[in-house]
């Protein structure tokens, strides 16, 4: 996601997927601090978030300020304190309703001090950004399908292997447990340089931009297999 947004000066973003049959089931990848995502999901703010409620009724992208009701609802909602804390005051949301009855959204946040031309750039590039959301969501569904295939004893990869090699899985597992690269190297009996190499491969395979996001995605999608010691 980060790479796809570099051409727009890397605005803050949230990619969110909600099961429309069971809105409690929500998945979030965001550039915000973990605290924001933890509070949002633990409080089930997707049920009252005016951006989400608007997206449920839309199939086209929308600017938050195109409809004064959205911003006024945001300010009157319980979510406002959280939004204000992280300076989430205005933005642009792209919407996708998929074949599995999910609502997927990519929201780009417009900071108060943002480039004045950013809004017009996003407006003129709506088609490209909408396609980015489609590609991002398709990648997520493929990762999810891979996870389900492994858990069912069936592998969706024609090579007979999971999306991560055993060593990549081991590195990601220990990283998700809070181990540093030197500690992982000691546990796995490899060099720190090799640990970094494997983590780099994990980042590429998961389509994220850094190890922190790879760990979060691996945990969220339950892609990490237990490692026996």
From Swiss-Prot:
InterPro entries given in the database record: Sig_transdc_resp-reg_C-effctor (IPR016032), TF_LuxR_autoind-bd_dom (IPR005143), TF_LuxR_autoind-bd_dom_sf (IPR036693), Tscrpt_reg_LuxR_C (IPR000792), WH-like_DNA-bd_sf (IPR036388)
GO biological process: quorum sensing; regulation of DNA-templated transcription
Transmembrane segments: none
Annotated DNA-binding residue span(s): 181-200
GO molecular function: DNA binding
CDD domains: LuxR_C_like
Gene3D superfamilies, alphabetized: Transcription factor LuxR-like, autoinducer-binding domain (3.30.450.80), Winged helix-like DNA-binding domain superfamily/Winged helix DNA-binding domain (1.10.10.10)
Database matches in Pfam families: Autoind_bind (PF03472), GerE (PF00196)
HTH luxR-type domain mapped to chain residues: 157-222
Superkingdom as given in the UniProt entry: Bacteria
UniProt keyword list: Activator, DNA-binding, Quorum sensing, Transcription, Transcription regulation
Entry annotated with the keyword Ribosomal protein: no
Family note: Belongs to the autoinducer-regulated transcriptional regulatory protein family.
Its biological purpose: Probable transcriptional activator. Binds to an autoinducer molecule.
Record-given protein name: Transcriptional activator protein YukR
Organism: Yersinia ruckeri
Recorded name of the encoding gene: yukR
């Amino acid at each position: 996601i980060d790479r796809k947004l570099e051409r727009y000066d890397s605005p803050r973003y949230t990619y969110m997927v909600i099961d429309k049959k069971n809105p409690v089931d929500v998945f979030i990848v965001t550039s915000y601090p973990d605290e924001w995502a933890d509070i949002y999901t633990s409080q089930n703010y997707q049920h009252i978030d005016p951006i989400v409620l608007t997206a449920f009724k839309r199939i086209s992208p929308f600017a938050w300020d195109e409809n004064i009701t959205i911003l006024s609802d945001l300010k009157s909602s319980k979510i406002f304190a959280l939004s204000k804390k992280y300076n989430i005051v205005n933005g642009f949301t792209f919407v996708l309703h998929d074949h599995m009855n999910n609502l997927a959204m990519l929201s780009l946040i417009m900071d108060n001090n943002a480039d004045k031309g950013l809004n017009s750039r996003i407006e003129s590039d709506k088609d490209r950004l909408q396609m980015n959301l489609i590609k991002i969501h398709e990648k997520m569904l493929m990762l999810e399908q891979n996870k389900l295939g492994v858990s069912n004893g069936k592998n969706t990869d024609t090579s007979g292997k999971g999306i991560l090699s055993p060593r990549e899985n081991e590195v990601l597992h220990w990283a998700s447990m809070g181990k540093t690269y030197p500690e992982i190297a000691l546990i796995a009996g490899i060099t720190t340089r090799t640990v970094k190499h494997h983590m780099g491969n994990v980042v590429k395979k998961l389509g994220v931009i850094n190890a922190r996001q790879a760990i979060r995605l691996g945990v969220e999608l339950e892609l990490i297999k237990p490692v026996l010691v």
